[in-house]
């Protein structure tokens, strides 16, 4: 991962309304293996976080100046250290206005993955641990705790600069359970949600279910295509990358690589060519299958509790909204009697 620029500042702040103290670094961090390892681990931790939101910058204003500063840096009007210093001073001000906020090390990293450039911003915290010294003594030691990554954002700079119509070039970690602790960080970036990742993922899965039903696939083939979808989407989520519908379509059916893509377009599900995956929604999309004595049943796990009800006590399975093709067969059989 080529690292263009990276710097770390420190904001000391307690969540009690007390003033924040900024310790700003004057120069960028030098390239090193330790720095590269840190960014790789940070990326992995960030990609693994559930509950991220995807969006875009607010209109630049006095309340949301960050995008203007970032644009000036990218155009060469100021260097990376000066840009980060201006940004972290703004973050410090917002921290002081939020009684819920606490300080930490603020990392800014401009790096490249493949052909895409990113800016990552994260508030890092330490955890207490222990180490064994060179003299074989046990001593306390601090380390960056990336498992406790709660405030971070990643901006796809290439997407922002080349596709101003995009509504998903920023991803950021949302607060859990309605907590407002992350609001000041979102205001610092100056971003708003542009894409509902869980909703988009649910729509994709609905489109896939409709596709499988319309194709009247055999049980084994339906299971294979479901696995192909879930495996690809889960991999994209792990990489922090979007689901590309045309690429997914080719993986689902190699002989007819555009069949699923054309199904989505013809039925007008309203999906963008690329959508952000939601891991929690994907985890619910597995198939239950069973076969015995001339009976074969297969359905997606997310339907359990809605269209499919299982009564363990009476050993019964109730199916609502019977598939249209099965319904037609049953009606023809009934009419023929």
From Swiss-Prot:
The family this protein is said to belong to:
Belongs to the YejK family.
Family matches, as InterPro entries: Nucleoid_associated_NdpA
Q: Does the keyword Transferase apply?
A: no
Disulfide bonds listed in the record: none
What is the protein named? Nucleoid-associated protein Avin_11450
**Which PANTHER family does the record cross-reference, listed alphabetically?**
NUCLEOID-ASSOCIATED PROTEIN YEJK (PTHR38772:SF1), PTHR38772
Any GO MF annotation of the entry:
single-stranded RNA binding
Keyword set includes Protein biosynthesis: no
> What is the protein's species of origin?
Azotobacter vinelandii (strain DJ / ATCC BAA-1303)
Q: Which residues form a coiled coil?
A: none
Compartment annotation: Cytoplasm, Nucleoid
The record ties this protein, via Pfam families, to: NA37
Give me the Gene Ontology terms describing cellular component: bacterial nucleoid; cytoplasm
Question: What are the record keywords, sorted?
Answer: Cytoplasm
């Amino acid at each position: 991962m080529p690292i263009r620029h990276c710097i770390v500042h420190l904001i000391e702040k307690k969540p009690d309304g007390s003033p924040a103290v900024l310790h700003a670094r004057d120069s960028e961090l030098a390239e090193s293996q330790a720095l590269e390892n840190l960014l790789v681990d940070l990326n992995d931790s960030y990609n693994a976080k559930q509950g991220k939101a995807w969006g875009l910058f607010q209109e630049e204003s006095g309340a949301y100046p960050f995008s203007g500063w970032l644009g000036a840096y990218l155009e060469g009007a100021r260097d990376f250290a000066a840009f980060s210093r201006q940004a972290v001073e703004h973050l410090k001000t917002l921290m002081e206005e939020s009684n819920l906020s606490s300080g930490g090390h603020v990392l800014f990293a401009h790096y490249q993955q493949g052909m895409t450039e990113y800016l990552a911003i994260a508030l890092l915290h330490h955890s207490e641990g222990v180490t064994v010294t060179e003299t074989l003594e046990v001593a306390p030691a601090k380390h960056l705790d990336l498992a406790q990554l709660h405030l971070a954002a990643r901006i796809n700079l290439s997407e922002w600069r080349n596709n101003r119509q995009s509504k998903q070039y920023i991803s950021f970690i949302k607060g859990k359970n309605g907590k407002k602790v992350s609001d000041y960080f979102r205001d610092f970036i100056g971003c708003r949600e542009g894409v509902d990742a869980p909703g988009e993922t649910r729509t994709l899965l609905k489109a896939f279910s409709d596709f499988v039903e319309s194709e009247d696939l055999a049980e084994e083939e339906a299971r294979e295509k479901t696995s192909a979808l879930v495996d690809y989407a889960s991999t994209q989520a792990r990489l922090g990358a979007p689901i590309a519908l045309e690429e997914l379509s080719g993986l689902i059916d190699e002989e007819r690589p555009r069949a699923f893509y054309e199904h989505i377009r013809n039925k007008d599900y309203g999906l963008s060519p690329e959508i952000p995956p939601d891991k929690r929604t994907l985890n619910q999309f597995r198939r239950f299958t069973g076969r015995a004595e001339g009976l074969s049943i297969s359905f997606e796990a997310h339907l359990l509790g809605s269209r499919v009800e299982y009564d363990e006590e009476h050993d019964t399975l109730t199916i609502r909204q019977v598939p249209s093709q099965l319904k037609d067969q049953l009606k023809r059989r009934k009419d023929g009697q």
